[in-house]
Amino acid sequence: MFATQSPRHLQVLLCRTKKFALASPPICYKVGAASSGSIRKFLSARFSTSARARNLKQSVLDNSGRHGVYLYPTLKPEPLNVVSAKDTTVVFSNGKTIEDTTCGAAVACLGYNNERVKNAMIKQMDSFCYSNSLFYGHEIGEELAAELIGGTNGEMAKVYLMCSGAEAMESAMKMARQYYMELNPRQPQRTNFIAREGSYHGSTLGALSMGGHVGRRKLFEGMLLDNNIHRVSAANEYRGKADGQTTEEYVQQLADELDRKFQEVGPETVAAFVAETLVGATLGTIPAPTGYFKAMKKVCDKYGALLILDEVMCGMGRCGSLHEWEQEGVVPDIQTVAKGLAGGFAPMAAMFINHRLSDALMSGSGVFSHGHTYQGHPVGCAAALEVQRIIREDNLVENVRKNGEYLGKLLHDQLDDHPNVGNIRGRGFFWSMEFVADKETKEPFLPSDGIAKKVHLTALNDVGISLYPGMGTKDGVAGDHAWIGPAYNCSKQDIERIVSKVKEAVVLALG
């Protein structure tokens, strides 16, 4: 075949053949008036190179354990390899199965392999998979935004769609800044934020700067925005409230601390106070004390600052209301959500803004000066929209609220008397156990004891459930906890089985 083609034809053929053109584009310009023999020689060399590449790939696989070239967060040892998942059962390549009682990282709120969500994603793929958000909008994004804003009962005005919780926090920080630059007159001096100790808002540098977990920040000290982000105490009744102090007194103490921090930083320079409405992974599902956020909002309003609530973990139904701030009696200026938004079927996150900010943008520049390549991804929007419709149509938030109370009761009944369970707290389908060496003094175990990891591995390997470990619960270094977060459609019987297995894991690990 090749011997009968003209040299020019051969040049076009080789350039248009993906195997050759992408591997070595200059070849296209060197073939010239090649003979059929040289063409055969060339093709033989290319195929031989391809074979060598395959052999090299196999060598890498053979000599590196299972993967070797995949940069996992934990490299030694490599994690278990998931091969399939259905409902709440996860199957690994070694044949082991577990019941996922944490929904991954509070993500897979409907479980795995939901047919409705899969079909919604496929339907969107059949239309188009990607749209340049800088220039174009799309109906599926508009439908999702309408669904989400409707879920706030009109309290929020607009929603910005992206891929991760860290992106959402970065967006919130920039939105807060831009809000003050849209006002007339502008307030360019508002470049500071006040956040809390022990918090976590994401792993990108801006979001990590906002977080207050010592252990997670340590490696990157010197790169973080420490001149712009200032800190107050966590709202942690178990460790922060003094003996004999009432909740009301403790809340007032925290409000006074926030007020003093505004004064210290310069009240006219603060853009926002930032907090997780219910603290997630770093401190172990700690609900705010009654009245806390109303008191914090009052301080923010006093100084003209915004309230940013991070509900990446605790929001979208996880705690028994679609938004956790509904249970706190406040409406944030900016809110971030992610994990339960699309249930893990696609990477999706969102930032809500209220009418105050929306009005400022609309009467000002009419532009949000921010952007991500995959923001508002159509397939992700389709997944999130179907997940939220299922949650609404199947009344799953009410199921979380009702069975969440039962989950908390059973955990207290089964584990309150354990000598190393210092505190059990949570809300909805988001509960933690904090482990202590001494229950009376609340003294934590030594970090070197690795208690949270021990409980996690015991649950995984010996009991067959997922318990999510957390370290640094007390001060960012010492302290251990583990949390559970079942799928929203779990029944009362599911909860009973889960708690029984949680108790088994704790007793096996700690005695």
From Swiss-Prot:
UniProt KW keywords: Aminotransferase, Pyridoxal phosphate, Transferase
Binding positions for pyridoxal 5'-phosphate?
G165, A166, D310, H372, T373
Which cofactors, if any, are listed as required? pyridoxal 5'-phosphate
Tell me which residues bear N6-(pyridoxal phosphate)lysine.
K339
CDD domains assigned to the protein according to its UniProt record, in alphabetical order: OAT_like (cd00610)
Question: Organism's domain of life?
Answer: Eukaryota
User: Which spans of this chain does the record mark as coiled coil?
Assistant: none
Keyword Transferase annotated: yes
The entry assigns this protein to a family as follows:
Belongs to the class-III pyridoxal-phosphate-dependent aminotransferase family.
Name by which UniProt lists this protein:
Aminotransferase FGSG_17085
